[in-house]
Swiss-Prot record:
UniProt KW Methyltransferase keyword: yes
Skewed-composition ranges (Basic and acidic residues): 681-691
Taxonomic lineage of the native organism: Eukaryota, Metazoa, Chordata, Craniata, Vertebrata
Biased composition annotated in UniProt, kind: Basic residues: 523-534
Keywords, sorted A to Z: Methyltransferase, RNA-binding, S-adenosyl-L-methionine, Transferase
GO MF annotation terms: methyltransferase activity; RNA binding
Organism: Macaca fascicularis
Name of the protein this chain belongs to: Putative methyltransferase NSUN7
């Protein structure tokens, strides 16, 4: 009743029906804008469950602003509360009551009615109960009381709409809340394929047999259609109005298709892209167990383990094991400790290479908070922030600090090579600011390499996604086709000592029986090609060694011949280093050489005393010489001094000269040989005395 301070006080039994009527009003007035279906009432047990939920999440005001006092004792629950459909309806009722709490309290005070409620959608008609529905006396009593005050309630609602200049009660809500409801009405359903139990092609064929058609986009389509997600190959998209039809088919009953928000699929696919065959994964704050199962199924063909921390209650073990068994997950290991309490050197986590923290966040990127709470097991406090369209600065600071602590702790695991950080928030304080702060304050004392920001590993499917990812962060803004999310990948270079070759990976897989039917003994075409090239290189190296020996022998002969002809002291023969350089270049050149600026352009036969031997060598090569493919090469010999003058005199009068030789035979025996420049001069006869041409001093006027 009303007390001296003008406050209203009511019990929890009345509170239940208040929430019911409030929800009906919200759905009725807002159905044209948000697209919500018209509802004619719910079972009594749904009202009771919604009252208990509302009691825990309602907005408490200061003592000076309190208009209505709410009860503190929860109502007794019923067996139907375990049913998921009842839970969804109850959360929807409670969330609607929370959004309209201020308006309803104003209407209740203005109409002078004792219980806190609103106008029903049935226009004050009696609610019809089904035959198999059990009625609750407290709910019936409150409903009768509301019907008796219908005129006063209608007048109070009209005055409230005039005061706010609103067409309906829906338009009194903040604009952010209205946009959120509009997105939620068109948001499609996302479901990932359990590839341990069924292949994507089998799912497509099964759906087609049931009348579903595969399309590129399901937006604004009322038929039975589905599409494949562009970011995750194992995720299907369905229109939201098909959920009641889909949950009753065998694909969902047998855990072959699992409904889940797309942001979680993006996170596990990012982790999968960073894994090797035998790398383990550590997951933090997973929320829904479907996220763990999805990660396990993606790594089913590997030898990886999926560690999940923070499961403190052992009572959940039987249910979890049953769930994972039904889904075909075999590589999941649950840790009892919270993530912050796990040491970075824990012996169980020495093979963990990728850590996936999914910290608790504001979730302001989520369009349908009720579905998110039910699917991801979030706290009901999640609804309080969404009902107001924002979050307080103090609470945002607390969440950001928790996220920073989890991220920095993940970066302390020295064996880990990557951290995938994911939230469902659109607040920079929870996303970019946390990641940049963690990178800035890394522990420089560790000998391991530091983390750095890496670009997204997911495909960027539109120009907008490319623009949003220019700073190496993957973002998805809330829209009519998806919830908002944030994804960041931190990596560091792998330790070179831990680098594993492809052959080692295949050998491990074969030892564990993962490559049944695949012959590893057969070398691939690429390996054969490499072996062939190595063999040819070996043969070429052997041939080059033989050529080097022949060139060295030739140079020795030329040096001895020059020593016998000249009486002056000449320099030693070509050093071994030059010989090696000549051999490394392959063969002597057969074509005309570029003239050296300090040497006259005429051919020199440096061994005139043995012309017959040289002719025989070039005209009739040995069989093994024919097998060698000769290549042109330039040979530089040491300076040759004239016998009629001293070396000092020559050095003082002329620059250092070098001889450039071609391997050609003399003209009498090889008529096809190129003529020497000295013989090509007009009117000059060839000279048979090769020695005289060798000893002739250079003619500077040529």
């Amino acid at each position: 009743m009303l007390n001296s301070t003008g406050e209203l006080e009511f019990s929890n039994e009345e509170d239940a029906e208040i929430i019911s009527q409030l929800t009906s009003l919200a759905l009725s007035d807002g159905k044209s804008s948000a697209g919500a279906p018209e509802k004619t009432g719910y079972p009594d047990s749904v009202y009771v469950m919604a009252a208990n939920i509302f009691q825990g999440i309602r907005i408490e005001k200061s003592a000076q602003k309190v208009l209505i006092k709410y009860g503190n004792e929860p109502l007794r629950s019923f067996s139907e509360s375990e049913d998921q459909s009842f839970q969804r309806l109850s959360y929807e009722l409670a969330f609607s009551a929370l959004k309209y709490q201020d308006i309803l309290e104003t209407i209740l005070i203005d109409s002078c009615i004792f219980p806190s409620t609103t106008i029903p959608d049935r226009k004050f008609q009696t609610r019809v109960l089904s035959d198999n529905e059990e009625s609750i006396s407290e709910v019936q009593e409150v409903e009768n009381l509301l019907n008796s005050f219908k005129i006063k309630l209608a007048a109070a609602l009209a005055r409230c709409r005039i005061k706010h200049d609103a067409l309906s009660i829906y338009h009194i809500l903040p604009e952010t809340v209205r946009k959120q409801e509009l997105r939620a009405s068109t948001l499609p359903l996302y479901a990932w394929i359990n590839t341990c139990k069924i292949s994507p092609e089998e799912v497509y064929n099964n759906l087609k047999r049931r009348g579903y058609n595969k399309v590129k986009s399901v937006l604004h389509i009322d038929d039975k259609v589905f599409a494949v997600d562009q970011h995750c190959y194992d995720v299907l998209i369905f229109p939201s109005h098909l959920k009641n039809d889909l949950i009753n088919i065998d694909l969902f009953k047998d855990y072959k298709l699992i409904f889940q928000d797309k942001s979680r699929s993006l996170a596990v696919h990012s982790v999968k892209a960073l894994l090797n065959m035998d790398d383990d994964i550590l997951m933090v704050n997973t929320g829904s167990w479907y996220t763990v199962a999805h990660m396990s199924i993606l790594t089913n063909n590997n030898t990886s383990k999926v560690f999940v921390c923070g499961v403190q209650s052992q009572a959940k073990d039987p249910d979890l094991k049953t769930l994972f068994t039904k889904m075909g997950c075999k590589n999941i290991e649950i840790l009892r400790e919270t993530f912050i309490n796990i040491e970075s050197k824990d012996h169980r986590l020495q093979k963990v290479k990728v850590i996936l923290p999914l910290p608790r966040c504001s979730g302001l990127g989520v369009s349908n908070p009720v579905e998110f709470i039910l699917n991801e097991h979030e706290d009901t406090e999640f609804l309080k922030d969404h009902s107001q369209g924002g979050i307080s600065v103090d609470k945002l600071h607390i969440l950001a600090q928790q996220q920073y602590e989890q991220l920095t702790h993940a970066m302390k695991f020295t064996k880990a090579q990557a951290v995938v950080y994911c939230t469902c928030s659109v607040c920079p304080e929870e996303n970019e600011a946390v990641v940049k702060k963690a990178l800035e304050f890394q522990d420089l004392g560790n000998k391991v390499q530091l983390y750095r920001l890496s670009p997204p590993v997911l495909p960027l499917c539109s120009l907008k996604e490319i623009q949003l990812s220019t700073d190496k962060f993957f973002r998805m803004e809330p829209s009519e086709i998806t919830n908002g999310c944030f994804l960041s990948i931190l990596t560091r270079e792998r330790d070179p000592s831990e680098t594993v070759s492809v052959k080692d990976v295949l050998a491990r897989a074969a030892a564990k029986g993962l490559l049944d039917g695949i012959e590893l003994g057969k070398s691939s075409k690429r390996e054969k090609k490499k072996k062939k090239s190595k063999t040819s290189l070996t043969k070429a190296a052997t041939t080059d060694n033989g050529i080097q020996m022949k060139i060295a022998e030739f140079l020795n002969r030329e040096t001895k011949a020059s020593a016998n002809l000249s009486e002056t002291v000449t320099k030693p023969s070509l050093p071994q280093k030059n010989t090696a350089q000549v051999g490394a270049s392959s063969q002597t050149r057969k074509h005309k050489l570029a003239p050296h600026p300090a040497v006259p352009t005429f051919m020199k036969n440096t061994c005139p005393s043995r012309p017959r031997e040289r002719q025989t060598h070039f005209i009739r090569p040995r069989p093994e010489d024919r097998m060698v493919a000769l290549k042109p090469i330039e040979i530089v010999l040491p300076p040759v001094f004239m016998p009629f003058s001293s070396p000092q005199g020559i050095r003082s009068r002329m620059p250092t000269q070098h001889l450039y030789c071609h391997w050609v035979a003399p003209k009498p025996l090889v008529p096809t040989c190129l003529p020497t420049p000295s013989l090509s001069r007009k009117g000059e006869k060839p000279k048979d005395d090769t020695r005289s041409s060798l000893l002739r001093p250079p003619r500077r006027w040529l």
